[in-house]
């Protein structure tokens, strides 16, 4: 089958926002107007088309990014709906990795919210062009220009309106297009009858002022336009549109639109803006990768003529077809039934069927082309972030960074039958979600699961019960602490056992130094002259990794340590891998005596919104929880307090805040960084873990 839409007429976009900004409703409306659904599902009724897991429909939030294909104005638009809840950061990251552009949805009453900042920062890291849709203009307290101001103040974004609202709250009835200088008036609530009129007189002056600001802002990003602007020449609408497109694709400018997805206003104009201003796969730089055979950097331009290269960005278990691997094709063509090389794992994989997804219904297709997003059935070894390429033209594309989990729970199966099922269920869930870890406590034999937050683990335990029919008891949430060294030291690990027959002998000298935050464990072999034979070096590294998994103070994994093996000795007969592994772990224990070991705890960036009268309470809450205030701002009659607070102190805070503010206070928290715990807290943690 020939290609249906050219690359220039393809858009791969994500819809990203803070939880509750109306993102899923916006996506629903897009699907409605592009003819994919005939009846609109309301999120708060639990009937939304994109939220197809039972947990999502119950909680009214989007957890997994469903990928959908739609058509608008002769273009194919592939949409990935991303979750706005902080616990599902990895879902946002993996979708940003494969998108070419995004629509950031704001709640017009609140403007930029904490999770908007998180996803905006991630999108900036990945260089994703964005347009902004200020949604919920029909809501009480909606304020479009306030929302635009928060983009400047909180995100330092060069964002400017290309539309203005006519009316607000109940009176929101239309939109002014600042490029055409026309008013679009909605005459019914389905958003299908739109009248294009002249701008009402009372809005004309404001519209002219904002059009002038828009032209100036766009001209600043383009020399030719700047010259025309300074010389007082008129900039045509076509030049303005081209200027906005270029600056948006270069991530130098962010057009802001307005509307109400719930009331069906402004969604079609937003779709027009997706086509007009967001890039096609041809507008963005070719993806880079490394040839696994030569280690040389290679590019894969977006073209059907290039060798096939794709990135797997999501694994899902589907009740009907089993394991689905979602992938983005960067170059080349792929037919169902063919073989590809998973260069990340070095394994050959067969693509069974290829499906194009529409929320939770699907259509089987024979071929995918450069720029497409689809799902494959039949891949056995592929996980999130793996590269799939032509067997004759191998390349490893940049993978997806996975954040470390910060919270853990103990899970215990209720019966022997549940025990076996639980193992399988947890393994499948971990395959789908790289931020979900499953570990068995060596000493107690308990199963511990770790993730990004309470909601994250709640949803996974719930899925284990519903999808895999596993009954389990769940312990209280615990913080995932880490351990590290704060000083450099040298230590010897010497292991010798002679007791009849073959003995054991391993002897190493290792220098330990603190590593940069987030760099993890790094091992360096600095052995000269073979004092430790080459075949035993991997055993030394393995011995360190295994013993670091259980720490030196309280049994928590060690991070951010460099280890340099620089001396040692061996025995011709008695030395073995096991002996050197044990010697390495003894060196680590010895180093702990002088390397100032420390326990690290996750620090959360907490944003608390509360009535002004309760500001004193909130400041007291932060201080009492070992937190430090980072900033405050007033919004209406509320105060917004930003603070860094240890996760360990935040359990149960929702109840405290609710009772202090009579239910009017809310808070959001997102993991920010790890920090040393105070000495007194460290001693308590060590005591507790030793069962004293």
Curated annotation (Swiss-Prot):
GO BP of this protein: ribosome disassembly
Heme keyword on record: no
Gene3D superfamilies linked: 3.30.230.10, 3.30.70.240, Elongation Factor G (Translational Gtpase), domain 3 (3.30.70.870), P-loop containing nucleotide triphosphate hydrolases (3.40.50.300), Translation factors (2.40.30.10)
Keyword set, alphabetical order: Cytoplasm, Elongation factor, GTP-binding, Nucleotide-binding, Protein biosynthesis
UniProt-recorded Gene Ontology molecular function terms: GTP binding; GTPase activity; translation elongation factor activity
Its biological purpose: Catalyzes the GTP-dependent ribosomal translocation step during translation elongation. During this step, the ribosome changes from the pre-translocational (PRE) to the post-translocational (POST) state as the newly formed A-site-bound peptidyl-tRNA and P-site-bound deacylated tRNA move to the P and E sites, respectively. Catalyzes the coordinated movement of the two tRNA molecules, the mRNA and conformational changes in the ribosome.
UniProt xrefs under SUPFAM superfamilies: EF-G C-terminal domain-like (SSF54980), P-loop containing nucleoside triphosphate hydrolases (SSF52540), Ribosomal protein S5 domain 2-like (SSF54211), Translation proteins (SSF50447)
Name of the gene this protein is made from: fus
Residues binding GTP, per UniProt: 17-24, 81-85, 135-138
InterPro entries: EFG_II (IPR041095), EFG_III (IPR009022), EFG_III/V (IPR035647), EFG_IV (IPR047872), EFG_V (IPR035649), EFG_V-like (IPR000640), EFTu-like_2 (IPR004161), G_TR_CS (IPR031157)
Primary location group: cytoplasm
GO cellular component: cytoplasm
Protein localization: Cytoplasm
UniProt-recorded name of the protein: Elongation factor G
Family from the record: Belongs to the TRAFAC class translation factor GTPase superfamily. Classic translation factor GTPase family. EF-G/EF-2 subfamily.
Residue ranges occupied by any tr-type G domain in the UniProt entry: 8-282
């Amino acid at each position: 089958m020939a290609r249906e839409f050219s690359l220039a007429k393809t858009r791969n976009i994500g819809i990203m926002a803070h939880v509750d900004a109306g993102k899923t409703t916006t996506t629903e409306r897009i699907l409605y107007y592009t003819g994919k659904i005939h009846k609109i599902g309301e999120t708060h009724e639990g009937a939304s088309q994109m939220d197809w897991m039972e947990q999502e429909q119950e909680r009214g939030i989007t957890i997994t990014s469903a990928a959908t294909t739609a058509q608008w104005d002769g273009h194919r638009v592939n949409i990935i709906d991303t979750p706005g809840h902080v616990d599902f950061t990895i879902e946002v990251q993996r979708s940003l990795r494969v998108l070419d552009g995004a629509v950031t949805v704001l709640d017009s009453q609140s403007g930029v919210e904490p999770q908007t900042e998180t996803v905006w920062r991630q999108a900036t890291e990945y260089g994703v062009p964005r347009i902004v849709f200020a949604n919920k203009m029909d809501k009480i307290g909606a304020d479009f220009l306030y929302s635009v101001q928060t983009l400047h103040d909180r995100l330092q974004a060069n964002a400017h309106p290309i539309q203005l609202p006519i009316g607000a709250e109940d009176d929101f009835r239309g939109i002014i297009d600042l490029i055409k200088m026309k008013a679009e008036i909605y005459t019914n609530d389905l958003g299908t009858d739109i009248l294009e009129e002249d701008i009402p007189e009372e809005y004309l002056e404001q519209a002219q002022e904002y059009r002038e600001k828009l032209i100036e802002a766009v001209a600043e990003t383009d020399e030719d336009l700047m010259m025309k602007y300074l010389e007082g020449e008129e900039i045509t609408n076509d030049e303005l549109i081209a200027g906005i497109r270029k600056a948006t694709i270069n991530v130098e400018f962010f057009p802001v639109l307005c509307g109400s997805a719930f009331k069906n206003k402004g969604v079609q104009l937003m779709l027009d803006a997706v086509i007009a201003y967001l890039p096609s796969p041809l507008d963005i730089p070719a993806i880079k990768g490394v040839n696994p055979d030569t280690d040389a950097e290679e590019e894969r331009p977006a073209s059907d003529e290039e060798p096939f290269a794709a990135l797997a960005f999501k694994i899902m278990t589907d009740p009907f077809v089993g394991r689905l691997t979602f992938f983005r094709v960067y170059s080349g063509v792929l037919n169902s039934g063919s073989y590809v090389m998973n260069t990340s794992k070095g394994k050959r994989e067969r693509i069974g069927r290829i499906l194009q997804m529409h929320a939770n219904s699907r259509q089987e297709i024979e071929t995918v082309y450069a720029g497409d997003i689809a799902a494959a059935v039949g891949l056995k070894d592929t996980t999130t972030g793996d590269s799939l390429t032509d067997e004759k033209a191998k390349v490893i594309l940049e993978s997806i960074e996975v954040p470390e989990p910060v919270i853990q729970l103990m899970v215990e199966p209720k019966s022997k039958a549940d025990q076996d099922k639980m193992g399988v269920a947890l393994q499948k869930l971990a395959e789908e979600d790289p931020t979900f870890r499953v570990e068995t406590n060596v000493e107690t034999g308990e199963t511990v699961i770790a993730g990004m937050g309470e909601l994250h683990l709640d949803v996974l335990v719930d899925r284990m019960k519903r999808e895999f029919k596993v009954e389990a008891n769940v312990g209280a949430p615990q913080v995932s602490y880490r351990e590290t060294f704060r000083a450099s030291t040298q230590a010897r690990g010497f292991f010798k056992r002679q007791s009849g027959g073959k003995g054991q002998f391993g002897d190493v000298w290792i220098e330990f130094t603190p590593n940069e935050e987030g760099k993890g464990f790094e091992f360096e072999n600095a052995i000269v002259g073979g004092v430790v034979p080459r075949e035993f070096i991997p055993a030394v590294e393995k011995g360190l990794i295994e013993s670091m998994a259980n720490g030196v103070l309280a049994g928590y994994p060690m991070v951010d340590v460099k280890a340099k093996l620089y001396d040692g000795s061996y025995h011709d007969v008695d030395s073995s891998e096991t002996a050197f592994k044990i010697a390495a772990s003894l060196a680590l224990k010895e180093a702990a005596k002088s390397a100032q070991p420390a326990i690290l705890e996750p620090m959360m960036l907490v944003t608390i919104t509360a009535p002004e009268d309760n500001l004193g309470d909130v400041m007291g809450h932060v201080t009492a929880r070992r937190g430090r205030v980072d900033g405050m701002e007033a919004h209406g009659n509320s105060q917004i307090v930003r603070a860094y607070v240890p996760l360990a102190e935040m359990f149960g805070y929702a109840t405290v805040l609710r009772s202090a503010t009579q239910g009017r206070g809310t808070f959001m928290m997102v993991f920010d960084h790890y920090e040393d715990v105070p000495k007194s807290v460290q001693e308590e943690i060590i005591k507790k873990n030793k069962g004293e």
